[in-house]
Amino acid sequence: MCIRDSLPPDTGDKQYFKILSALAGVRPKGAMPLQAVTNSLSGRFSRGSPVFIISSCEGDGTVPAAVRDLVGRGHEVTVLSPSSVDFERLVSRIPRMSYEVLKLERQNRLTTLAGSGAQVIDWMPDMDLSQALMQVRGY
């Protein structure tokens, strides 16, 4: 899906499957700040509709403001944040002290988002997507 793609409103397990299928085909592209994206799309969101953000929350200082704005407009915001710090640790040798500092910085970013009213999921590399999403659905 790209910014212009959307799914028609629906409910239930069928809609959940449609969402998961659409997310499976998503590929990152562009470098537009999240707040610019949410500002341009907010007119298409019904008041109170859930908004799902997949982001490492790194390198874009507009993420906290975008989340605050969405929550302030009455949206239920969920942030699924793949842990690039832990992934990087799996594939390279990050010195322990550097890892601890990066991990703490990441935790502070996620805590800020949670404090803004978003449900935040710290998605670890060893966790299946379905496991992470179960945290959202409350299973």
Where would I find each of the regions flagged by the language model?
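Exposed, interaction-prone extracellular/peripheral surfaces
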Residues: 4-139
